[in-house]
UniProtKB/Swiss-Prot annotation:
The chain crosses the membrane at residues 182-202. This is Synapse differentiation-inducing gene protein 1. Residues 1-181 are cytoplasmic. It comes from Rattus norvegicus (Rat). Belongs to the CD225/Dispanin family. Enriched in the cerebellum and also expressed in the neocortex and modestly in the hippocampus (at protein level). Expressed in hippocampal neurons, both in cell body and neurites, however its presence is enriched at excitatory synapses and also found in postsynaptic cells.
Length: 258
């Protein structure tokens, strides 16, 4: 009866070991590891003496276990306690050179997790595509601003108003009908050189007719001609009057000497 129980125990241990080899998981049920000297505890420290288990195995099973590779079966709960007793929870920071050397030395099938400082750019730095950062001081930062003065706007409005008033006055002057210079023409005809005065009077009437028809171009031409003839008539008439006066004075003075 005892031999049957021992054989069942050996079969259970062998199945668990084979399952651990196949899936690579930690055995949480068996706290024993097979070595060349037999089953020994994986916790030889004094604080884990309570976890030691003594089991007997058949000579055949021990001989079969000697040929198998050595395998350690760990308890995750106890392993966590042992790690916490030696290392406190903390973030370990390493430089890039150390991490690179470690990566070259470890096997390709290993996976390790490391925590490094966050190299996020600050408000005074710029990030380039290659991952480098450049620090900017307050003097290097230039902000292009645009200033606008209210007085300049007022001056601009005044200039625009002046320009608009000038253009309006010019437009009004151009739109004004030309003058006929009728009074000047009559004076030149009666009091001055009458042939030119008569021509100026005729052109003044032509100016009025063109304005009545709405032909401002013809009216302006007639008005300029009437003004020119009237002024010329007055000039010639004034010259005639001055000449006559001088001749009369000379004649009278000659008679007095006689």
């Amino acid at each position: 009866m005892d031999g049957i129980v021992e054989q069942k125990s050996v079969l259970v241990h062998s199945k668990i070991g084979d399952a651990g080899k196949r899936n690579g998981l930690i055995n949480t049920r068996n706290f024993m590891a097979e070595s060349r000297d037999g089953l020994v505890s994986v916790y030889p420290a004094p604080q884990y003496q309570s976890h030691r288990l003594v089991a007997s195995a058949a000579p055949g099973s021990l001989e079969g276990g000697r040929s198998d590779p050595v395998q350690q079966l760990l308890d995750p709960n106890t392993l966590q306690q042992s790690v916490d007793s030696h290392y406190r929870p903390n973030i370990i920071l390493y430089s890039d050179g150390v991490l690179r050397s470690w990566g070259d030395g470890v096997a390709t099938d290993c996976c390790e997790t490391t925590f490094i400082e966050d190299r996020s750019p600050t408000k005074d730095s710029l990030e380039y595509p290659d991952g480098k950062f450049i620090d900017l001081s307050g003097d290097d930062i230039k902000i292009h601003t645009l200033s606008y003065d209210v007085e300049e706007e007022e001056e601009l409005q005044e200039l625009e108003s002046d320009y608009s008033s000038d253009t309006e006055s010019e437009d009004n002057f151009l739109m004004m009908p030309p003058r006929d210079h009728l009074g000047l023409s009559v004076f030149s005809m009666l009091c001055c050189f009458w042939p030119l005065g008569i021509a100026a009077f005729y052109l003044s009437h032509e100016t009025n007719k063109a304005v009545a028809k709405g032909d401002f171009h013809q009216a302006s031409t007639s008005s300029r001609r009437a003004l020119f003839l009237a002024v010329l008539s007055i000039t010639i008439g004034t010259g005639i009057y001055v000449g006559v006066a001088v001749a009369l004075i000379a004649y009278l003075s000659k008679n007095n000497h006689l």
